[in-house]
Amino acid sequence: KRNLILSPAFKEFEQNANPRTREKLRYAISILETVYPVPTKFVKKLVGTDFFELRVSVDNEIRVILFAVDNDNINLATNVILLNGFVKKSTKDYDKEITKAINILR
């Protein structure tokens, strides 16, 4: 089982989600926490960054959670830091959210 660390920004994102979205987020996070290897259906490495994204689809909207791990290979990681989350509206959202994630890690 992987150790989850939740940033204040992630906790706020989760608390502000409606109950159905929160339930789906928790399900996806439980997979990230317990399933080896991590299914690529849920998780992708963000090219050119140290971050991964966990995607959850709810009511035709995609929620993205940015996270970091303690190993270059996610399947060997023991610690996962959930940094921040957002509703994906366009690919432009990523730059702003990646900057936020970098600042949270500091």
PLM region spans:
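Conserved catalytic cores of phosphodiester-cleaving nucleases, focusing on short active-site segments
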Residues: 83
